[in-house]
Amino acid sequence: MFDIGWTELLVIAVVLIVVVGPKDLPPMLRAFGKMTQRARKVAGDFRAQFDEALREAELDDVRQTISDAQKLNPVNSLREAMNPLRQMGNEIKADLQKATTVTENKTEVPPDAVAAPTPSMSLPETPPLVATPAPSEPVAAAVVQADTVAAKPKAVRKPRGKIADKVDAAAAVAVPVEKPKRTTAVRKPATLKKPAQTKKDEA
């Protein structure tokens, strides 16, 4: 404990015998032992109290972490987050119910106030007049105008070099092609197809 060797203890014992004397040395050693025992007991009590305080602090920390974990329950946080949404949904439902009840009250009309005429179930004696179709002259005029527009030749870009002369001569010779008039196609009569022969039919 004090890093005292045997030789040093022997020197201390010799000094105590010389100073205190052989007669008073045993009661003094007993008092010193009791004092050491008391000091150890106080140190043990202090250590026990200190250890108990540490355990309580650790338990408090554990209790605190458990309570934090319970407070951090995701279900509770989701409930708190959904609560405003639930309130908004209830408000919207209430508004919709008010709107539907108001419109139902406004649309209710007493049956005596509105009398719908009953339609007759018989056919009229004279057929209704149908407007005669307009003459087809404007359509023909539109076709003639379309032919004159189509008859205009497109401007041809002049190529460079010797080929340009050949292309110019060919373009001058080309005659603008008139668009053929639209005619209705004649339908061919439907012919019956012969069923295809299979190998089983041949056999």
Swiss-Prot record:
Q: Which domain of life is it from?
A: Bacteria
Tell me the segments the record calls region Disordered: 179-203
Membrane topology for this entry? Single-pass membrane protein
Ranges that cross the membrane: 1-21
Q: Which UniProt keywords apply?
A: Cell inner membrane, Cell membrane, Membrane, Protein transport, Translocation, Transmembrane, Transmembrane helix, Transport
User: What subcellular compartments does it reside in?
Assistant: Cell inner membrane
Q: Which GO terms describe its biological process?
A: protein transport by the Tat complex
Write out the GO MF terms.
protein transmembrane transporter activity
Indicate where this protein is primarily found. Answer: membrane
Tell me which GO cellular component terms the UniProt record holds. TAT protein transport complex
**Pfam families in the record, alphabetically?**
TatA_B_E
Q: What does it do?
A: Part of the twin-arginine translocation (Tat) system that transports large folded proteins containing a characteristic twin-arginine motif in their signal peptide across membranes. Together with TatC, TatB is part of a receptor directly interacting with Tat signal peptides. TatB may form an oligomeric binding site that transiently accommodates folded Tat precursor proteins before their translocation.
Describe, as the record does, how this protein assembles with itself and its partners: The Tat system comprises two distinct complexes: a TatABC complex, containing multiple copies of TatA, TatB and TatC subunits, and a separate TatA complex, containing only TatA subunits. Substrates initially bind to the TatABC complex, which probably triggers association of the separate TatA complex to form the active translocon.
Q: Which HAMAP family match?
A: TatB (MF_00237)
**Per the similarity annotation, which family is this?**
Belongs to the TatB family.
Protein name (Swiss-Prot/TrEMBL): Sec-independent protein translocase protein TatB
Q: What is the lineage of its organism?
A: Bacteria, Pseudomonadati, Pseudomonadota, Alphaproteobacteria, Hyphomicrobiales
Please state the gene responsible for encoding this protein.
tatB
